[in-house]
Amino acid sequence: NSRAKLLGLELQPWRANSDKAEYIVLCGQHDKSLQWQGMPPLGKWVSDTMKAIRKVTPRPIVWRAHPRAPLQYLETQYKDVIKEPPVKLQGTYDSYDQRFDALDWAVISYSSNMGPHAIIRGKPAFVGESSLAWDVGNDINNLENIENPIMPDREQWLNDYAWTEYTIEEISEGLPLNYLTTLL
C-alpha cells in the first residue's frame, strides 16, 4: 500500500464512535458533470432521496450541496435537515473541505468525491455504480439498509483507488499517460 501512503491516504477505522454516530450526510454534486448524465434533475433526486431516508430512519440529515449546485432552501422542506455550506480551503483554486464528523452515521453520495472520502474516513457510504467507492460501498438504491450498512475490508480498494490520483510531479513526468497506455 505504498502508493496510498505516498498520497497521504490512510484508512480510518470503520465508524469508531458508532454508539454516538447519528447523522446521515447527504452530498450533492455538480449536475452539469458527465457523472450526472442521464440522472433526474438534481433537486428532484435530492428530494426523492430525503423522502427515501425518512421512510427508513428518523436520523437527522446533514445536507451538503455541491459548491456549483447549491439548491437553495431545499433543506427547509424537511424535518431534521441541517444545511452545511461548502467550506473552501484557503490557498487552493477549487478545493473544499471534505471532512466528516465523529457523529456521522453514513454518507450518501451518487458519484461525487465524497463517497470515496467517506470510505477512507471510516464512514459507510451509499453510492451509485459509477462511484469510485462502489466496490466497498452500499448500493444507493438500497437505503433500507442504512441502519445496517456493510463495512467490508478496504485495503485492496484503497490501493486501487490510489492509482486514480497523481501528484503534480508525476503528471509533469508523464506517469499517468505512461500508465494509461499500458492498458490499451
Task: Report the location of each language-model feature.
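Leloir-type glycosyltransferase catalytic cores
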Residues: 1-21, 135-184
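A structural signal for the main folded, soluble domain(s) of proteins
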Residues: 4-10, 114-116, 121-128
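A generic local structural motif
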Residues: 11-13, 47-48, 93-95
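Conserved catalytic-core segment of nucleotide-activated headgroup transferases in glycan assembly
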Residues: 19-75
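Short, charged, surface-exposed secondary-structure boundary motifs
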Residues: 36, 97, 119-121, 135-143
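Donor nucleotide-activated moiety binding/catalytic core segment of transferases
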Residues: 51-54, 59, 67-121
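Short glycine/proline-centered loop/turn elements that form peptide/ligand docking sites
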Residues: 93, 111-115, 125-137
